[in-house]
């Protein structure tokens, strides 16, 4: 990059590193087909972008915003949450409350033994080779 062009831009963009980022982004935009705001004069895209910044035909603030948007891969959209969704802590408490309300049928040992006598053991099946 031509030193004269960088020196011309320093009063428009205070930080040299920011200037390089903005000029490189503008040069990429020019390479991808963006309209030039000044005559090319047989200069390459980085020099043209620096001349555009120096002559204030493009705004450094707009370039910075476009640079940030070009680097974003995911745009987060804030959506309001539904109020009807129960909280995890309150859901656990309601499950415990439901467990205590269930009435279990009590069986005596004799009733259990009678029920087990009626069950037939499963028949053993010979193993078949596949």
Curated annotation (Swiss-Prot):
Q: Which SMART domains match?
A: RNA_pol_Rpb6
State the residue spans of region: Disordered.
110-130
Gene3D superfamilies under this entry?
3.90.940.10
Q: Which UniProt keywords apply?
A: DNA-directed RNA polymerase, Nucleotidyltransferase, Transcription, Transferase
SUPFAM superfamilies under this entry?
RPB6/omega subunit-like
The entry's cellular-component GO terms read:
DNA-directed RNA polymerase complex
A molecular-function term among this protein's GO annotations: DNA-directed RNA polymerase activity
What EC number(s) does this enzyme carry?
2.7.7.6
**One of this protein's GO BP terms?**
DNA-templated transcription
Enzyme category, top tier:
transferase
Q: What InterPro entries does the record tag this protein with?
A: DNA-dir_RNA_pol_omega (IPR003716), Pol_omega/Rpo6/RPB6 (IPR006110), RPB6/omega-like_sf (IPR036161)
Which reactions appear under catalytic activity for this entry?
RNA(n) + a ribonucleoside 5'-triphosphate = RNA(n+1) + diphosphate
Biological function: Promotes RNA polymerase assembly. Latches the N- and C-terminal regions of the beta' subunit thereby facilitating its interaction with the beta and alpha subunits.
HAMAP family referenced in this protein's UniProt entry, alphabetically? RNApol_bact_RpoZ
Instruction: Give the family this protein belongs to, as stated in its UniProt record.
Output: Belongs to the RNA polymerase subunit omega family.
Question: Known NCBIfam families for this protein?
Answer: rpoZ
Complex formation: The RNAP catalytic core consists of 2 alpha, 1 beta, 1 beta' and 1 omega subunit. When a sigma factor is associated with the core the holoenzyme is formed, which can initiate transcription.
Name of the protein in its database record? DNA-directed RNA polymerase subunit omega
- Source species: Rhodopseudomonas palustris (strain HaA2)
């Amino acid at each position: 990059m031509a030193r004269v062009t960088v020196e011309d831009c320093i009063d428009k963009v205070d930080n040299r590193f920011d200037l390089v980022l903005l000029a490189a982004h503008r040069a990429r935009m020019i390479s991808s087909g963006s309209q030039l705001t000044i005559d090319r004069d047989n200069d390459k895209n980085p020099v043209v972008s620096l001349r555009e910044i120096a002559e204030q035909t493009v705004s450094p603030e707009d370039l910075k915003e476009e640079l940030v948007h070009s680097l974003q891969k995911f745009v987060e959209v804030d959506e309001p949450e539904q109020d009807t969704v129960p909280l995890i802590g309150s859901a656990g408490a309601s499950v415990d409350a439901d467990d205590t309300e269930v009435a279990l049928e009590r069986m005596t040992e004799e009733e259990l033994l009678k029920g087990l006598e009626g069950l037939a053991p499963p028949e053993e099946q010979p193993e078949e080779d596949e």
